[in-house]
Amino acid sequence: MLQNHSIAEFDPVLWDAIQNENRRQEEHIELIASENYVTKAVMEAQGSQLTNKYAEGYPGKRYYGGCEYVDIVEQLAIDRAKELFGADYANVQPHSGSQANAAVYGALLNAGDTILGMDLAHGGHLTHGAKVSFSGKIYNSVLYGITAEGLIDYEDVRVKALESKPKMIVAGFSAYSQVVDWAKMREIADEVGAYLFVDMAHVAGLIAAGLYPNPLPHAHVVTTTTHKTLAGPRGGLILSACGDEEIYKKLNSSVFPANQGGPLMHVIAAKAVCFKEALQPEFKAYQAQVLKNAKAMVEVFKQRGFEVVSKGTENHLFLVSFVKQGLTGKAADAALGEANITVNKNSVPNDPQKPFITSGIRVGSPSITRRGFNEADASTLAGWMCDVLESIGKDNYDQVIAETRAKVLEICKRLPVYGD
């Protein structure tokens, strides 16, 4: 018999962990570039009765009965995704960005085929051909990188493409702060007869707002997550505007039944909500502020003598290198965490440290902007971060941490996430 008990009543240990996480999110400043705060409407969709419904297949072609209403939900998400990004194909079923990427590879490649992707150590993603990932184990991965100035080396991409003759070139990143020339990538792909696959997960929100170039006119296939700058539920999305129906059929089959079974209908509903939110004028204003806040923070770090990789940012994130200071990313991450400022350690180009230690941090502005931070707030925050970083290993460290934590708590109270 169904028991309608609350988590607090039934599982107080779990409830305490949830409440403590709620408190942490309210009392800490979130600067992890891949994180964001969803609206209550998105959470409402994820907590709906749609979680009960199994719906293998696609709208109108299900393997289960009783799907007439979840068909409406999924079709809404599909139509809104197409409108948002200018696509003529959308698959909203991938459970994550990595699973979306796996589906693209499965649709267009065979095991052992060559892919050319961005080196993880230079800003790429695990699924772009890293040897520890399925993408580097199942496929023959060749990697391109960035120049000494921190910019994608398109000549390096072209030379390696001509040498390796990849079946697919992967463009996109997880830690690159400049604008990718999608047209140049397509030109190189066409020169060697390769597919161009773009993973726009980090900048999807900026693209939706028209503030970062859209890869859809250039790529054969595009994937994204639905969180990060898009500020929706954790999930994946596959898009295309290439007009090739055979590719679309292969993509659908690669998601289901090849890689996944039943879709998560409650998450797809939340994706539909987030796509509608991203179609509103307020969303563009939000993304514009994300850019302004990131740029404001960069200027402070540079003024305080820290190296910003590629010398700036044209999106929501930037990397700070501590090679010159002899500081590790792990130590910086931990120190900032003590002050209630959350970042992630990150490798920088030619990093002398191991990937779990690193010599840098990645900083992102989406979450603070959702709280209501403006450029002045962002600049002030960057100054506090520099104070903490400069105090590491010095006698005043504990004092700086305590003072910074107090200031963080004050601004978090002034600019709450949810306000209740």
From Swiss-Prot:
Whether Lyase counts among this entry's keywords is no
The alphabetical list of record keywords is: Amino-acid biosynthesis, Cytoplasm, One-carbon metabolism, Pyridoxal phosphate, Transferase
> GO MF annotations for this entry?
glycine hydroxymethyltransferase activity; pyridoxal phosphate binding
CC annotations in GO:
cytosol
What pathway does the UniProt record associate with this protein? One-carbon metabolism; tetrahydrofolate interconversion; Amino-acid biosynthesis; glycine biosynthesis; glycine from L-serine: step 1/1
Tell me where in this chain the PTM N6-(pyridoxal phosphate)lysine is found. K228
Protein location? Cytoplasm
Q: What does this protein do?
A: Catalyzes the reversible interconversion of serine and glycine with tetrahydrofolate (THF) serving as the one-carbon carrier. This reaction serves as the major source of one-carbon groups required for the biosynthesis of purines, thymidylate, methionine, and other important biomolecules. Also exhibits THF-independent aldolase activity toward beta-hydroxyamino acids, producing glycine and aldehydes, via a retro-aldol mechanism.
Q: What is this protein called?
A: Serine hydroxymethyltransferase
